[in-house]
Amino acid sequence: MTDETRQGRLILIDGDACPVKEEIYTCAYRHKIPVRLVAASYLRHPDHPLITMVMAGDAFDAADDVIAEAAAPGTLVVTGDILLAERCLEAGSVVLNHKGGAYTANSIGAQVATRAIMADIRAGLDGQGIGGQKPFSKADRSAFSNALETALRRLK
């Protein structure tokens, strides 16, 4: 655990599919909170002292493992991965998805169960598909920014 995480002053980004990295950077600059961008391989990111990049490698769940190991009380994790969110909540982190929804200890069990049911349904459709997610919108981006500000205020 680093000094950053001991102080509860760290934002961890599950970076491979995160559409709100720029919003996170902007907010981090304003609050002077370090950001650790974690991904399987290199992602472009600002050259700024608050931003660090961790390349976790291609092993299955390598990036998730790096994030879960750094998760601690007071850290903020941004991920769309429900199973990673569950691990981070267990470690005491505040966890948001990229649309600004908060994963909580009260809701994560139902979200994990729903994920499992949907995976079973998709597997049973044998390539027919059930549609994907709606495109990421400006409203989603705004909702995330508002939720991020609220979450960071709770970390102080």
From Swiss-Prot:
HAMAP family attached to this UniProt entry: UPF0178
Pfam families: DUF188
Species of the source: Jannaschia sp. (strain CCS1)
InterPro entries, sorted: UPF0178 (IPR003791)
Protein name: UPF0178 protein Jann_2168
Origin organism lineage: Bacteria, Pseudomonadati, Pseudomonadota, Alphaproteobacteria, Rhodobacterales
PANTHER family cross-referenced by the UniProt entry: UPF0178 PROTEIN YAII
Protein family membership: Belongs to the UPF0178 family.
